[in-house]
Amino acid sequence: MNFLWEVENPTVTTMPLNVSFANRNYDLDYDSVQPYFICDEEENFYHQQQQSELQPPAPSEDIWKKFELLPTPPLSPSRRSGLCSPSYVAVATSFSPREDDDGGGGNFSTADQLEMMTELLGGDMVNQSFICDPDDETFIKNIIIQDCMWSGFSAAAKLVSEKLASYQAARKDSTSLSPARGHSVCSTSSLYLQDLTAAASECIDPSVVFPYPLNDSSSPKSCTSSDSTAFSSSSDSLLSSESSPRATPEPLVLHEETPPTTSSDSEEEQDDEEEIDVVSVEKRQPPAKRSESGSSPSRGHSKPPHSPLVLKRCHVSTHQHNYAAPPSTRKDYPAAKRAKLDSGRVLKQISNNRKCSSPRSSDTEENDKRRTHNVLERQRRNELKRSFFALRDQIPELENNEKAPKVVILKKATAYILSVQADEHKLISEKDLLRKRREQLKHKLEQLRNSGA
């Protein structure tokens, strides 16, 4: 019941083992374990549950206790001001060489310490949300990351105790078999292990966050649709917990890539869009090793140097619809008209591209053609104007009217033509009558001549 006593007395805190972590914020630690508080009657509650199995569960009943379920994958680390929890300080002190041993047989070699730290950080310990000191049983109950929806505390404690027993056995075996190392080597390895434990103590397993394997050619990005504030606060403290054993200690680099935004753009994004920080992992080769590999290309096929994991925070903007905004006044054109507008835009773009891609000679040719066309069009208009003036002069009613419009000229000209045609028909009929009269007079004159002879 040590864990329940710690939960009931949240004000009791453990002093940090390292002096460098003096700026600890205990209020945030209290907030991190607050979801695990349950009712005051734990013993009676579980005793009642064992006695009455057939009764329906109460609203505050821990129904998952009887199933002995494993905890779910851990949540993102909570917002903390410093990395100073006693659990990972205990881990750092337990795996670091001690001064009272004087570099004797009780210390690990550098390779063994790196391997054990890698197994501890990358194994099931992080997935079970516990990082404990093997020598101290009180740290078994110290919860670093735990989902409040699940409460498989007893099963997780059993697994942790079994894991710690195996680690203690491995420590004893390695203590009896490993040769004595120098104090300088142990001091350097202890400093590196302390930095590693301080950096990756409150981290989660990367296989949970990044389900895809890490390749040298591509670095897949895992995007989550969680709340932006929670994710940004957790991504500030998120570090990679994978490090290869027997590798040169190299620092983990964390940098942020966010595009610069102006004031107007930021105001618009606050209304319609929401920023999400996406953490991506990629492998980057140090510049020193890169220069060495570039200077000696003829050394043959050698093993590529170990490159550290680099965490990048990218800026991804997802559009969120603002339902409180007034409706837009943009008109929805029908499909046919929209297709016509799109086709017109495409044709305009094609013509612009042709104009831009055409050489200067084609531009001069087009200018010459346009100039000749303008001259011919001007000549045609002048001739048409002269013909209208001539037609106006032929009409008796519009002969002296210089401001007569073209429509009036055409109408009067049509009426005048019809009247002239009617006069022509009359004159033709009169001509025919006169010709007949002439024929008759000629025939009568010949008869008179014949009778007089």
From Swiss-Prot:
Which residues are tagged as glycosylated in the record? Answer: 72
Subcellular localization: Nucleus, Nucleoplasm; Nucleus, Nucleolus; Nucleus; Cytoplasm
Q: Can you tell me where the transmembrane regions are?
A: none
Species of origin reads Rattus norvegicus (Rat)
Q: InterPro entries recorded for this chain?
A: bHLH_dom, HLH_DNA-bd_sf, Myc-LZ, Myc_transcription_factors, Tscrpt_reg_Myc, Tscrpt_reg_Myc_N
Q: What is known of its domains?
A: The 9aaTAD motif is a transactivation domain present in a large number of yeast and animal transcription factors.
Q: What would be the name of the gene that encodes this protein?
A: Myc
Name the residue ranges of motif: 9aaTAD. 115-123
What is the designated name of this protein?
Myc proto-oncogene protein
Pfam families given in the database record: HLH, Myc-LZ, Myc_N
Composition bias, kind Polar residues: at what positions? 349-361
Keyword Acetylation found: yes
Biotech relevance, as the record puts it, is:
POU5F1/OCT4, SOX2, MYC/c-Myc and KLF4 are the four Yamanaka factors. When combined, these factors are sufficient to reprogram differentiated cells to an embryonic-like state designated iPS (induced pluripotent stem) cells. iPS cells exhibit the morphology and growth properties of ES cells and express ES cell marker genes.
